Amino acid sequence: MEEQKPKGSGMEKIATFIVDKRNLFFLLYAFALIFSIVATGWVKVENDITTYLPEDTETRQGLTVMNDNFVTYGTARVMVSNVTYETAENICSDLESIDGVTSVDFDDTTDHYKSASALFSVTFDGTTTDDISVHALHTIRDMLAGYDTYIDTEVGVDTSADLQSEMSVILVLAAIVIVLVLTLTSRSYAEVPVLIMTFGAAALLNMGTNFLCGTISFISNSVTVILQLALAIDYAIILCHRFSDEHETKDTREACIAALSKAIPEISSSSLTTISGLGALAFMHFGIGRDMATVLIKAILFSLLSVFTLMPGLLMVFSKKIDATRHKNLIPKITFLGKFDVATRFIVPPIFAVVVVVTAVLANKCPYCYSYTDLVTAKQSESQIAHQKIKNTFGVNNMVAVIVPTGDYDSERQLLKDLDSRAEVKSTQGLANIDAMDGYKLADALTPRQMSELAGLDYEVAEALYAAYAVDQNEYGKLISGLGDYKVPLFDMFMFLQREMKDGNITLDGDIQETLDDLFEQLNKAQLQLQSDKYSRLVVYLNLPEESDETMDFLDTMHALIAKYYSSDTYIVGNSTNVKDLSSSFGEDNLLISVLSALFVVIILLFTFKSAGLPVLLIVVIQGSIWINFSVPTIQHESLYFLGYLIVNSIQMGANIDYAIVISSHYSDLKKEMRPKEAIIAALNEAFPTIFTSGTILAVAGALIGVMTTNPVIAAIGTCLGRGTVISIVLVMAVLPQILLIGDTIVERTSFDVKVPVDLSRVNRTASGNMRVSGRVRGYVNGVIDAEIKGTLNGTLNASVTSGTTIEPTKPDFYLPESKEQAAAEWAENYTEGEEV
């Protein structure tokens, strides 16, 4: 045979470079993976979901002010059941004696003793992460080991570490399922390690580059690996199957090059819907969406990179093993389902329409919640069990902090009084209402005479102390007019006295000094928690749940009460205000994600199928699956954490739509060769292995996350994702085929095509003799052909065909005028490469 060597296309050149330079890529990946292993330790994880609230929300602003100005000591609610009150009193004394415990609140009221159960409110000497608090908590656990004890606290709780431990177990179980699924759907057992290594590299690269994002959320840190696997495993499978097909007629290298050059555009196109769905998350006002979109899209891109640059080399290395371990197709044909779909094509769509309308209404009434404190997960941690036990016995403990400008004790006192008078308030605490001694409060203003009587000082000593205070505050007028009526808040005077004693300006007798030292220690802790140079913090305990309409209304009432005394620079901070801020932005975020994810996908499908009708049909099916998915919580009367809806909505639209695309693509191709009814049956058989692989992995991953994690946010995402994927699979297999059959007319009438002029420069090869041809050929062939043909023939066919081959008249892509056909044929026959066209 004589043949001029062709010039490869741009994609073929890229594929050739990747395959031929595979050892270079292996080396680069080795360095990159080593770096990623090290860099995973650099990733900072944010466990506080309120960090991602918009900057203009009250909760976000209030938390910033509170964290910058106050210290919040660790606390614990310790419930001991089946004890007498006398035993409880002894336990209280033992708890107070523990090093690291500041105070223990316990009395005989029903707030602390009920139904033979005692509730101790413990305050520690340090914050929730300080060693002194953690050690004290361990001591409490050891001390109460013999009792029926429940401890609800955030002290020593590392949410990120606990979640990572749970996700590691989930990942192992998911990996086992994935290996089984890949084994069933693979064509060779040796393909499985290639797929696993490709994905493992992509996952590690993504984790190792998360530090570039600065700080990522605990949600992204925990679920990305599993979602990356479930969403991107298809890419590796596509290339693997392409290689298997090409390897039947080509040697390993040529097969790998051909497979990669064809797979790159196919896989890239497939990934666009997933990326667009995830991209919609980035437009959320709630910053967690941007965080997840960044990490997950990065994961998809690394998956593409690994499939395009690492997997070809692995296929070359494992090619002999792949050939040696080939097995028969283990996935059965589902012709029976296809026949069912054909038979019910006029029955199922109307039923589906009714179901969609009903579930859309139910989904719109889904009982969303914005606080996960009281959510019950399938698997519960010790802390969650304790929280529920204490809640069921003693009720809720809903605390909010009111932050106001400092310096006006009278306004603080009056505000606390107004709040205490409300039935919705259990108790309040602030410097203005903390008892000092002899009936005085810490913020009460005393004259020198009152101070001398209270502290047991000589009047002259008290007067001298007041004079020194007046000088320190630059209030010289008081010295001139006389100090008899000069009033100073008790707290301010004690803090001034402490400073003067530290500076050595004042010395006292030993007994008084020791008493004051103990007092100063308590006052210092009170100040750190309740007062700074700019703000005062008032603590309010509500008789209301964290999340209810009544609670939201009372927050408005609190704002009105605060406005009576302060005109600006005030904040209310707590789980309830967090709920209020999240719920106010949810409606807009929900609409934004639903519209954008659907819009992005429609645009991609529009140019993929070149039909305005088909994308609408596919979107209707997937949107229907979303509505059905989120109607379930309404039917079950179970609260759904709002993030579960927002995140799964975008993933379901971006990822599950691929199942519908696979069936539609096969159907569109096959109906050119056979009748629509036969085409849809064949399309289901061809698409089922892909849908089974991807769908099973995503559904199992979601289900495992939902039932095996104790974190309510992650569990909500997993449960909704697993359920939504199963629903999507059922609909695309048992509803979409009928819709495609009866919607053919709509698809055809709304189809369009981009007119591309005939590119005669493609007629640039001539060859004669025996030859093997692989790829698309357009032109004139004169000779005997022995091949599998799938395409359009414009001319005369005289050949033997195998059973099952269909030959039907069809409209060619373009026509040459009859007068031009012979001239074109003669020109092509005499054309030589390089000749000017």
Question: Which ranges hold each PLM region?
Answer:
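Extracytoplasmic
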Residues: D56-Q61, D68-N69, S81-T123, D158-A161, ...
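Structural signature of multi-pass, alpha-helical inner-membrane proteins
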Residues: E2-Q4, G8-A30, I37-G41, D56, ...
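Juxtamembrane segments of multi-pass membrane proteins
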Residues: Y52-P54, E58, N69-T75, V83, ...
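Generic recognition of flexible, low-complexity loop/linker segments
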Residues: V65, H387-K391, Q414-D418, Q522-L528, ...
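Acidic/glycine-enriched edge-of-secondary-structure segments
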Residues: V43-T57, P367-Q380, Q498-Q513
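A structural signal for short secondary-structure junctions
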Residues: T393-N397, A423, L519-F520, L528-K534, ...
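Membrane-embedded transmembrane helical bundles of large multi-pass transporters/channels
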Residues: M1-N47, V101, T128-S371, E546, ...
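A short beta-strand structural signal in non-transmembrane regions
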Residues: G74-N82, C92, D107-Q164, N398-T406, ...
